[in-house]
Amino acid sequence: MMRVIGAGFPRTGTASMKAALERLGFGPCYHMFEIITHPDHVDRWLPAATGATLDWDRVMAGYHSCQDWPAGFFWKELAEAYPQAKVVLTVRDPHRWYASFRWLTSQAGIRRVDPEEAPENVRPMLEGMRRMQPLLARLGREAISPDWRFGEEVPEAQAVDAFHRHVAAVRETLPADRLLVFDVREGWEPLCRFLDVDVPDEPFPHLNEREVMANMFEEMAHGGRLPDLFGAGH
């Protein structure tokens, strides 16, 4: 059963939030990394590319929280499907977010690694991400701009406007007692208070998502294996 829904855009600290939620007992947490490391999950999501209503219990089977796209794109549907779940909207300075989002969407990584030329044991993941493109195209059209596609340049003003629209939509839709607008730089205190759990006696996890993604691309292209994205070092 979904207990915490992440409504933030990618590159708003979603990897750090995944680690934090799992530390607080709300794991496993669904993140885009789950699709990368479990290519069979693609079939759960693909019907949404054409606007079909998803069976959320099937999509989220075994997970108790979610962060990042594609789940975060469907925050409203998830909030309706799981009315007892709380929602965390991760935010950051919109212009700093844009710089990070621009890096992510222009990354060569997955797009330039031909599945046929990749090490055999990462080919299923690359093929899975290729199959995800129709859904990613929908996310880009509806969240950012009707004429924008992943891998293309998006003007800063247009992207920042989309960011502000999204934050406003979430705020306007959900009651204050169900929503936390949260910057991961705030640390444990507001998150734990909102979720009604004790504050851990350890630093809040701050994962460098760009570094995680860059290392992942490098290992996929040359290492012949999928990286441990949330291993002991994180």
Predicted regions and their residues:
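A conserved mid-domain beta-alpha-beta active-site/ligand-binding segment of alpha/beta enzyme cores
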Residues: 124-167
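Conserved nucleotide-sensing/catalytic segment adjacent to the nucleotide-binding pocket
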Residues: 47-78
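Phosphate-binding beta-loop-alpha motif at adenosine-nucleotide cofactor sites
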Residues: 92, 150-161, 171-190, 194
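Short His-Asn-centered micro-motif
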Residues: 6-8, 32, 67-71, 91-92, ...
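Conserved phosphate-donor/acceptor-positioning beta-strand/loop module used by diverse small-molecule
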Residues: 81-103, 191
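PAPS-dependent sulfotransferase catalytic core
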Residues: 1-59, 119-140, 200-234
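Short catalytic/ligand-binding loop motif for oxyanion handling, primarily in non-cytosolic enzymes
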Residues: 14-18, 38-39, 74-76, 95-100, ...
